[in-house]
Amino acid sequence: MVKWKIVFTKQSLKDAKLISAAGLRQRAEKILAVLEKNPFQNPPPYEKLIGDLYGAYSRRINIQHRVICQIYDDLKIVKIIRMWTHYE
């Protein structure tokens, strides 16, 4: 099985600090591990986003926060856009 490469935006790296401070690091790491193996694995469930984030996918960390990513299937890359709320 091919491992997917995870890349982070500057914003997602800032969000990682907030996630850690909020005590959600372990949950976020589980989601990142799933994305590294197979970003289309279900569960945990994911949603395709619309609007400003059209083409991106969302996975729930908790009721408020999400991991938002873009998936480049041909390159086997998962780009993490946000790891905090995307409702702001």
Where in this protein do the model-derived segments appear?
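Enriched for short, Lys/Arg-rich terminal
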Residues: V2-L18, A22-K30, I50, R59-R66, ...
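A short, surface-exposed loop/turn module that caps and links secondary-structure elements
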Residues: A33-R59
